[in-house]
Structure formats: C-alpha cells, structure tokens
Amino acid sequence: MAPKVGINGFGRIGRIVFRNAINHGEVDVVAVNDPFIETHYAAYMLKYDSTHGQFKGTIETYEEGLIVNGKKIRFFAERDPAAIPWGTTGADYIVESTGVFTTQEKAAAHLKGGAKKVVISAPSADAPMFVMGVNNTSYTKDINVLSNASCTTNCLAPLAKVINDKFGIVEGLMTTVHSYTATQKVVDAPSSKDWRGGRTAAQNIIPSSTGAAKAVGKVIPTLNGKLTGMAMRVPTSNVSVVDLTCRLEKATSYDEIKKALKDASENELKGILGYTEDDIVSSDLNGDDHSSIFDAKAGIALNSNFVKLVSWYDNEWGYSRRVVDLIAYISKVDAQ
C-alpha cells in the first residue's frame, strides 16, 4: 500500500512535490498544511504554474480542503507543526517544505501530531542527509527525521560518486550556475546578511555561497574535506547547472569518463543520472526527472588528471521527484 503523505508548506517545492506525487503513484498525499494561503488560493496556485504549466487533472475545493482528480485532501492552516493533526488523516510521512523547520528538533514537532517520519526538503544542520542513488541504502528504520539534502547536492553527488568510484577524486571545486529562487529580490532591496543577494534577480549575475559541495562529504564520507564550491545566481527562472573541476587520482581520458557516466546512467543510476551528447540549453531540461544530467559535450580535460565536468538539473522538478522517491524508498524499508 502506498505510504500516506502530508506536506507542510505549499510553496514552490511543496506544490511541485504534490504534482510529482500525483504523477508518481507510489505515494498518496492525504493532507497539506500552510497557514499563509486559503484553500481556494491553494487550488489556484496548484492549477497554474508559470514554469511547469497547468496542472494536468481536476482541482476543486470543499469545506475541509482540496479535491484533486476526485480525491479529497485535507488542508490545514497551523503555524505550529506540533498542532497539525496529521494523525487524523493517516499521514505517516511528512514533507517539511517550509524552509523554516530544518533541524531535527524543529522538524520532529510533526511527530506530536501523529506523523511517524519527517523528510526535510532542504539541507539540515543536524538531520541525516540522504541522496537517492548515492547513500539511500544507509537509511535505517530507527531514523525519524531526515533530509533530502539540496537540489545542488542531488546533482553533484551522483556525478562525484561515479567519478570517485572509477578514478578517485583528489580534490575539487564546484560552481553551480543557479536559476533565481524565491529568496531573491524582484527589485533591489535590503538583505543585511548578503548584500549582493539583495540585488535584482532578473538583471544580475550574483555570486553567492552554497554548502552543496561540502554536503557531498556527508553523503560520500570518502570525499569529506575534498570538495567545496560556490554559486552564481543567474536571471533564469528554472534549471541550473553544476561545473565540477577536479583532480583525479587515476590518469584517464575524457572519453573514459564519458563511458563511465553513460554506463552508470543506464544501470545503477538509471533515472537518477542522465547522459546527453545533444547540444542542449537550460530550457530543454525544464521538467526533467533526473537529479543530474551529464552534458558530455560541455566538459573538458586539461590533462589526464585534471578535468571539468558539466551536469544539468531541474532544481525544482527533479529535486521534488527525489523527495517522493525517498519517501517511497524509506516506507519500504520501514515495512520490512
């Protein structure tokens, strides 16, 4: 039986997790909580999306929530996670997608309302992080609060895993050229902690920090301390790209690297890692399910031990799909 899921926070990731769950079929969304939007507005936001298009299905409202494709979904408006009555809906697995409750202690408040597990759709300072295809098999059923890491970590980790397993990574630097997100500004506005981040998103290339590369060391312990990185926020609405420049232990050719990644994309990382030799640009990957799509034509090698690898990701859709996949996976482990 499909695990019953609740979503806390109906913003970008919350809504796209919802859409993916409807398409996925392996999880059953039964409830949503968001104190900042009313039910009829939630229906509107779910139906129309500037990036991913109209919802392919039916959406109605009733006195207690939404009716999506004929199925009733409860809608709550609680500010305190501990006050959300997940238990009354049968929701065992909660997607914590507000971006606010990202520590184990804060996210665990959902358990007080009857939930059994919480998956944080963001990096966490202290919750164990899992990346599908990389370290998800290390999950054990005693873990109640976990993180799906970040969209960028989900892109970088499968790429780094294949390269490290086959050739060994001595050290590396990552840059993500990242589409703007909801935390950025439409016009120049105050941003006391990050002055550059307060500048207009649609007019600027904005250097920024990211913990995504360091986080790879948490999901692949042998790479701990070997990777770090930064971000360039750019004026595109969706789809981002990772540039991993690394020094290899084992001398190899770029063709051998391509072969290793192509093999992985067709076998152990199928559905997680994509591979393309087409002359694609970012918009071609809008709505792509993969965590990471290696661009064979975009990378270069300086010599047999020093390479630049390029991999794309839909930072909204692909990441949200992995949230759903992670819940489907851990529910099977929990049932054993």
Swiss-Prot record:
This protein's GO CC annotations: cytosol; extracellular region; membrane
Active site: C151 (nucleophile)
Source domain of life: Eukaryota
Record-listed D-glyceraldehyde 3-phosphate binding positions: S150, C151, T152, T181, T210, G211, R233
Pfam families for the chain: Gp_dh_C, Gp_dh_N
This enzyme's EC code(s): 1.2.1.12
Keyword Transmembrane helix found: no
Pathway(s) annotated for this protein in UniProt: Carbohydrate degradation; glycolysis; pyruvate from D-glyceraldehyde 3-phosphate: step 1/5
Catalytic reaction annotation: D-glyceraldehyde 3-phosphate + phosphate + NAD(+) = (2R)-3-phospho-glyceroyl phosphate + NADH + H(+)
Main location: cytoplasm
Localization annotation: Cytoplasm
NCBIfam families reported for this sequence: GAPDH-I (TIGR01534)
Name listed for the protein in its UniProt record: Glyceraldehyde-3-phosphate dehydrogenase
Name of the gene encoding the protein in the UniProt record: gpdA
